[in-house]
Amino acid sequence: KHSKHCIAGKLVDSNKWVRPVANDSGAELSTQQIKYKNPYGKFLTKTLQIIKFTYLKHVPLINQPENYLIDDQVWKQNYSINESEINDYLDMPSDLWGSEDRVSYNEILNKKIVIKQSLYIVKVDNFKLYKNSSNKRRASFNYNKVPYDLAVTDPFFEKNFSRINELQNILCISLGEEYRGSCFKLVAAIY
């Protein structure tokens, strides 16, 4: 996101999604803001880590209701989960905000589409990674028998591409910010 970072996770006690943001408008976080501290030093936050952070207030957007404005306290690492535990955090929506690769922002604004949550961790079928003719990273898969073809923002695309047969076919899907009248569905993490 604009050379910055989008981080999200689930609360371990309630399975509720939270997305830390830098301002009331849902701005992405700087590299400094996503560092955590543990007894060995300061490091960049990675997926599957259990991180403690404090926030100033809930700042929901109509397309991203999980947003929380963080304060300036350094995050703390509190263990990690391993990949086999991801199943404990799966979401079970009937679909991924419809069957297209995007959602009309006007339909969200006009409440024709209500976004109750903009993040899902889901188990998918027929999962494939590829680069399209424009060299853009994509994932195709079925969820609840509906075919999807979405952009991939997971920074480990190449690594996952080379080990696709070892993956659990679990994806974190995020509804992105408004861009040219749409909120695009993004594969933010692959497990």
Task: Go through each PLM region and give its residues.
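N-terminal ordered "arm"
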Residues: 1-49
